[in-house]
Amino acid sequence: MELNEVYQYTKEHMEKTIDAMKRDFATLRTGKVSTAIVEPIRVDYYGTPTPLSQVGSVIASDATTLVISPWEKNLLKGIEKAIQEANIGVNPNNDGDVIKLFFPPMTSEQRKEIAKDAKALGEKAKVAVRNIRKESNDKIKKLEKDKLITEDQSKKAHDEVQKYTDDYVKKIDDMVKSKEEEILKV
């Protein structure tokens, strides 16, 4: 393994951490409803737990309403049941053709709570970035121990990995701040 491979590993994994945090952020409720809220929901489709998005279309018809149109009408009851079991804070409204989810406007307490969740997701991502830094630094130490790089190269490599870490932690902080503002905006 060379230093370039260590750098590549570090960047790739830190970028994956950012992507994972973005996916997590998508499930958080903000002022307007997002279809990502129902992504984790699984519907019993002929005995197989299937993502809701694969048994029907999910559309945000306005800022507070999601409309779920199943591709098979016989799935309406199953979708309704799955939504109730998912405990996402709303009751499904089944009109025989589609299921509508009406999300009430969030209270300031709810907004603060969700903002806290966003902050926690950011902290989780920062821990992941720091763990990647540790793994990369361990790889650099091993290269030095195996006499594949000099002590000076090792020091520079550690500094470079720290620079990546600082950059990604700053990205995470910026994303959390932006998400908090989005959540708290009335």
Swiss-Prot record:
UniProt keywords, alphabetically: Cytoplasm, Protein biosynthesis
Any one of the GO BP annotations: cytoplasmic translational termination
Record CDD domains: RRF
Pfam families: RRF
UniProt keyword Plastid present: no
GO CC terms: cytosol
A GO MF label: ribosomal large subunit binding
Keyword Cytoplasm: yes
Domain of life: Bacteria
Cell compartments where the protein resides: Cytoplasm
HAMAP family referenced in this protein's UniProt entry, alphabetically: RRF
Family membership noted in the UniProt record: Belongs to the RRF family.
Role of this protein: Responsible for the release of ribosomes from messenger RNA at the termination of protein biosynthesis. May increase the efficiency of translation by recycling ribosomes from one round of translation to another.
Protein name: Ribosome-recycling factor
Lineage: Bacteria, Pseudomonadati, Campylobacterota, Epsilonproteobacteria, Campylobacterales
